[in-house]
Amino acid sequence: MDCVRTAYKVRAYPDTEQATMLRRTFGCVRVVWNRTLADRQRRYTIEQQGTSYRETDAALTAWKRDPELEWLGEVSSVPLQQALRHQHAAFGAFFAKRGRYPRFKSRHGRQSAHYTRSAFRMKTDGLWLAKTATPLRIVWSWPDIDLMTLDPTMVVVSCEPDGRWFVTFAVDTADPAPLPAVGETVGVDLGITEFAVLSTGERIPNPRHMGRHERGLKRHQRRLARCQRGSNNRAKQKQKVARRHARVRDARRDFLHKTSTDLVRRFDRIGIEDLNVAGMVRNRSLARAISGCGWGEFRAMLEYKAQRAGRQVVVVDRWYPSSKTCNSCGHLLASLSLGTRHWTCPGCGTRHDRDINAAKNIDTAAGLVVAASGGPVRPDQATGRRGPVNEEP
């Protein structure tokens, strides 16, 4: 039976001694990551050679024997080994063009440590981590799931910049049974004014989470700018700013989860555009609004939830002119300005709402993609009919 990895993220409440030990572990993980990355770069610059995982593992052993770095042995070796594995995997993803070049880690950002099965134990009194004298208290958020029976393969202990602690349990579970078919498909046109418009005519408003918190965030950032560097007050104020950002991030993620789950439950096939978000944010006037929508995260949620539910997410070519094509007769306009929200097809006289028309075309194109076994969908430029447009602002 196929297995799927599921993550359960819960709040953790370490005591003072545990927090000190975990922060020390975070620091050691960060040092190992940064020194390994620096050595990789130095070796490639001088010798034009890569570095294998075995070589980084040998270097870590040598560092622990160095009197200047012997404090690396005060924490569990498992998170340090995992840091090496993750960096090796990160370079593999980079060379395969599936990720960015690995970057150095900062002590000011999110801190984390990964523990495999050999370095933790789940007991009734809490989570026992390697080299800790007391169990870490966590708050389990799924009353219908017994944590003791999950058998996690890995746990990740993390601390956010706003001071909150979390534990993430990675669990391999059996592939869930697919949802029953409902016989409905949908095209989704993502936007800024409205987060999404569906081919059914439904409009999902953009909650604009950043806009609702922007005033308070600016106030806290001004206070932070007035604080003296290195002072305790600056550290406290910096945490308040991070907490504001966390509220925005959590609210956006909650909205994306609920929206994606609703679509996966309601439709057998979901068509979306392959938006070039990285290119779109280069527009200075729209970059902030686009970044606040979370289109990329929304697509990722749709894809993994659909896979687990036995649904289909079909990505339509980004150059497909969904807004300029009449969904009734297929007439293709020569041009359509961004400010035009309604237009009348000169071919059949149908009056279109720009976004609903685009969503319907995306749904149709997604069906063609499935019929063509995943082939790209673009109208034939040689046969597409072009003509003037009757625009209605």
PLM features per residue range, with description:
Residues 36, 83-94, 356-366:
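Stable alpha-helical structural segments in soluble proteins, enriched in small hydrophobic residues
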Residues 120, 125-129, 164-167, 195-196, ...:
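Hydrophobic residues embedded in beta-strands of well-ordered beta-sheets
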Residues 43-69, 151-152, 159-299, 370-393:
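Substrate-contacting helices/loops that form the catalytic groove of nucleic-acid
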Residues 1, 5, 289, 293-393:
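Positively charged, low-complexity nucleic-acid-binding target-recognition regions
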Residues 54-160:
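Acidic carboxylate diad motif detector
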Residues 1-79:
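Gly/serine-rich nucleotide phosphate-binding loop at the start of the catalytic core
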Residues 126-138, 169-174, 200-202, 347-349:
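Secondary-structure transition/turn motif
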